[in-house]
Amino acid sequence: MIDYIRDGQAIYRQSFATIRAEANLAGIPADLEKLAVRVIHACGMVDVVDDLRFSPGAGAAGRAALAAGAAILCDARMVAEGVTRSRLPAANRVICTLNEADVPALATELGNTRSAVALEHWREHLEGSVVVIGNAPTALFYLLEMLDAGAPKPALILGFPVGFVGAAESKEMLAADSRGVPYVIVRGRRGGSAMAAAAVNALATERE
């Protein structure tokens, strides 16, 4: 029989202990410490903590919004599926509109990606929500355009789009001017659905 740890909770405990031993968390505020640990856990790279950028009080803002029942708006199904429902404090709605029937036609009409124009369906849910971008840079660019045009403001933006075209730029644009919305990003090309969902899961409950 192969010798390996079979207890899921023991694996989590050892993983988080290893992260805290190896990662430099000195610059992470208390309200984002668990978020940083879970983002590292999701990608396996302790150095990603060096690329985390955030506005003051972002973690507290996200926790308060979720506790108050805020909707969680996700740019991709993989992000939405990664949110652990049992951790959510108020049976929060997890919304992804990418597969709405009119999105392909809307993308053609507006001359943008489906990931971007799917945010048109977010308008009624945006105010006070937690926005989670874990895939498409165009979705984050489009969100900023919507806010510039007067769309309601979410309570928090978790900006984790990934890739080689627009990912770094969209996140830097958010950090440079968050339109008055608290935010957390990982700078550069790194990001993705697993890290984005991990950030939500960390804010959803005080449980490790």
From Swiss-Prot:
Active-site residue list: 41
Top EC class of this enzyme: isomerase
Catalysis: reaction(s): precorrin-8X + 3 H(+) = hydrogenobyrinate
Keyword Isomerase: yes
UniProt entry tagged with the keyword Isomerase: yes
Keyword list, A-Z: Cobalamin biosynthesis, Isomerase
Pathway(s) per entry: Cofactor biosynthesis; adenosylcobalamin biosynthesis; cob(II)yrinate a,c-diamide from precorrin-2 (aerobic route): step 8/10
A GO MF label: precorrin-8X methylmutase activity
Annotated substrate binding sites: 15, 38
EC number: 5.4.99.61
Any one GO biological process: cobalamin biosynthetic process
Family per similarity comment: Belongs to the CobH/CbiC family.
Function description: Catalyzes the conversion of precorrin-8X to hydrogenobyrinate.
Self-association and partners: Homodimer.
Protein name according to UniProt: Precorrin-8X methylmutase
Gene from which the chain derives: cobH
